[in-house]
Amino acid sequence: MKISNARVYRNGRFERSSVEFSDKISAFDVEGGVDAHGAYLVPGFIDIHTHGAIGYDASDCRADEVPALAGYYAAHGVTSFCFTTMTIGEDALAQAMRNIRGYERQGAQAKCAGVHLEGPFVSYKKRGAQKAENIRMPDLDLFYRMSELSGGKLKIITMAPELDGAVEFIREASKVCAVSLGHTTADYATAMAGFEAGATQATHLFNAMQPLHHREPGLIGAALMAGAEVELICDGLHIHPAVINAVYRMFGKKMIIISDSLRCAGLCDGNYDLAGQPIVVKNGRATLLDGTLAGSSSNLLQELKNVVSYGIPLEDAVYAMTVAPAKAINSFGEIGSLEVGKCADMLLLDEELNLK
């Protein structure tokens, strides 16, 4: 198939071009094809932190429900996702790994680019919406079992670097997948020790961590000094637009836009469950019963529109949803950009950034 007269996103900018592809991209600047009438042609979005949508959650959905979830992602511009679990019990976590292990993309579905374990090695004080009774100290044996059960799909683990044994855990776990620091009370020195041990990312920056302070910069300051990649929820509820712009200016191409979406995404306001905990969604804002902000009900397509409306250039917003996350999970050789030989995961967007 060929698409012509598109504004193609390559090398961080848009250029008028055409593309020929089947499962993979075969050529650019070809003759003929479907006229895109100047629409934007961008790589498919990659969401490395999403728990679920349309009633399904990675922590408890059945294997036969994953395709429906993957279909929702694709319908909202996400062509690759990391199946993200919560802090749940070991048996439930093992079952989640088995459920995703056998998933294979079919038709109009997103690809599972890997698994993101959000916990269970997190701080009790900064657990956010993670269930307290399932929090554990770092356990390499458990980590290795989950990696094996996932069929080698483990790409990220979120953990708190201040826990007993965390530095040694990070040193070993980072040989298997990316270690992201989050849900943590860590001060600057402790966070830096985590990065020096091998951590490379920070999970949903500003949320579930100590704030940036001029006398104690905490994880946020450590992430900046370490050159770490940082996730950011851009639903307009978790982070103020001015702070999103500040993160963009500070971290540049290290910023990764995520949804942190829950099973309520794509559904109406109401009462839902989050890994065994009741949550309430009102005006799109998901909270525990005590008012603690949980994940989001958003998606990356909406968040693209959000950040562009906040003043971030479209080229850089697309980078934060494609190139940056692909590099973060060591998958840039296959996905994340439009290049000959890479997967033909592409989106056509109109001037209002709607899917065409």
Where are these regions (language model features)?
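Histidine-rich, glycine-flanked metal-binding segment
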Residues: 1-42
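Active-site core of metal-dependent hydrolases
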Residues: 148-267
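His/Asp/Glu-enriched, well-ordered alpha-helical/loop segment
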Residues: 222-232, 248-349
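Alpha-helical scaffold segments that flank or form the walls of functional sites
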Residues: 40, 48, 58-111, 134-149, ...
